[in-house]
Amino acid sequence: MRHKLIVFDVDGTLLDTSEGVLSSVKFAIKNMGYELPSDAVLKTFIGPPVQDSFSRVFGVMGDKKNRMADLFRIRYKNVDLLKAEPYEGIFDLFKALTDKGIAISIATYKRQDYAETIVKYFGFDKYTNIICGADFNGKLKKSDIIAEAVNLSGSSVGSAVMVGDTIQDNIGAGAVGMDFIAVTYGFGFKHRRDIDSIRGTNVIGIAYNPLDILSILERGKNEN
């Protein structure tokens, strides 16, 4: 296999974090006096920086946006962070990659302290100690986080591939010159139009379950 490093997103790629994230999102919305949006809209909060999602959905800016984000973070850190489930087959994938001598890094929009806590709690640190998350001010772009995950591994972007479930993962990988594998079992890329929108970019395959990722790496492309 030409890829020597696999960089994984967390939400919607390693873990189904929907229960915890949505619980904290709802807490922040209710405490600011807003009505809850539809379930479809709520699900769009999973993955991107939460302050950006509050701005997008409620039009809040400045202090109000920061207050909503603070409410979310306090609740998430103290109550909801570990309300998550590893996707079936993800540890089988990690073991197979490790057995083949392929390095693993993690790059997530989760804040750095949250990322370290949840990754270690579920045991992914058995396979990697490179866990790169967002800064406390939310200034880092996904491309910055991905680049850091590659740099810390000692690999090059040309020998690395990003695995994720959102367009932000796809764009972030492309911005640093990396290949990308899109997963459909998470929160993004649920519709054919979503997948079609990223074809012809840096995408080398579409994974419908975690073990599909290994097959894509072994053959170099997704035949579906």
Regions found by a protein language model. Give the residues of each.
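Substrate-recognition element of Asp-dependent hydrolases with the DxDx(T/V) motif
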Residues: 25, 90-119
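N-terminal helical cap/lid subdomain that shapes the substrate entry/recognition surface
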Residues: 2-92
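Conserved H-loop
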Residues: 35, 125-129, 156, 204
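Conserved Lys-Pro-Asp/Glu-containing loop-to-beta segment of HAD-superfamily phosphomonoesterases
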Residues: 5, 142-172
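Glycine-rich phosphate-binding loop signature in dinucleotide/nucleotide-binding domains
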Residues: 1, 99-102, 152-159, 220
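Acidic, Mg2+-coordinating phosphoryl-transfer loop and its flanking beta/alpha structural elements
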Residues: 162-205
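A structural signal for the hydrophobic beta-strands that form the central parallel beta-sheet
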Residues: 106, 133, 162-164
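A short, structured active-site edge motif that brings together acidic residues
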Residues: 125-140
